[in-house]
Amino acid sequence: MKVEDFDFDLPEELIAQTPLLDRTSSRLMVLDKKSGEIKDQHFTDILSYLNEGDALVLNDTRVLPARLHGTKDETGAHIEVLLLKQKEGNAWETLVKPAKRIRKGGTITFGNGALKATCLEELEHGGRILEFSYEGIFYEVLEQLGEMPLPPYIKEQLADQDRYQTVYAKENGSAAAPTAGLHFTEDLLAQISAKGVEIIFVTLHVGLGTFRPVDVEDTANHKMHSEFYRLTEDAANRINKIKATGGKVVAVGTTSIRTLETIASHNEGKLVAESGWTDIFISPGYTFQAVDALITNLHLPKSTLIMLVSALSNRTNILAAYNHAVEQQYRFFSFGDAMFIH
């Protein structure tokens, strides 16, 4: 299929720049994946679509305040560093701006010396392998010095950094939030659990590649970025049991769906305890083996994420739903409204 087939007109003013005061006050567009029927609801109405014996699968990754501002020791020049992926020990793959100022052996100081970095290797496109030195616990130092790496389409500063974390975020490692989960509060999760719905966690650390535009014409030629995922034995067993007894598996976010489908795709549809790196690309024609329904946000035109949701329903239904969302003034992208495809 052509990437152009997944385009739609989106007025810029519908891109949500700030989160709503109440996480659960978002709207919820409900799409019947087979018939294409659309209903306009509120996010708390998700309760009526979840039943006893179903599984709600959420990604418990935690966004790192991964954007750092420092100075080049040799000249005092301002350097911006974005943490991308942890390597061995205290070494990280990073994106440095301006990259030309930091060559192999160059050093950077952050926050009055609380954190220092040495460049071990130069990569293409501004990438650098930096080794960090610090006292104490790295993630605590990051919390003090780092900023949230908000998506490029968010132009406003975030007043409360916790609003770019889910309420159940636990496992450090993401460069971006699994945004479908931002709509949940602890109270709503408790109400869902009280209905007899099993709440199950997976981990997938979201990389910045999630914002990278698709730069090929044909979807068959697209190469996905890879992201780390993990599923525990307990979680795998619980999901398998729910599927065996006829319950629905409802994934919260495209990251949860990619984790489950990665594992199911090479275990004959079953889920097993597993961790690794996935570059699964789900687009129309894909046969889902683990997931029945999806709670997600409204995605960018021509993105791999709109291709994924088109695979769960079909391209015609999804584009009709997205055009409806534009007409009804839904809020789009990370801080926007939600969609339930079932």
Curated annotation (Swiss-Prot):
Listed GO biological process terms: queuosine biosynthetic process; tRNA wobble guanine modification
Keywords: Cytoplasm, Queuosine biosynthesis, S-adenosyl-L-methionine, Transferase
Organism superkingdom: Bacteria
EC numbers, comma separated: 2.4.99.17
One Pfam assignment: Queuosine_synth
Localization, UniProt: Cytoplasm
One Gene Ontology cellular component: cytoplasm
InterPro entries in the cross-refs: QueA, QueA_dom1, QueA_dom2, QueA_sf
Coiled-coil residue spans: none
Family, per entry: Belongs to the QueA family.
Subunit relationships: Monomer.
Protein name: S-adenosylmethionine:tRNA ribosyltransferase-isomerase
Organism annotation: Listeria welshimeri serovar 6b (strain ATCC 35897 / DSM 20650 / CCUG 15529 / CIP 8149 / NCTC 11857 / SLCC 5334 / V8)
GN (gene name): queA
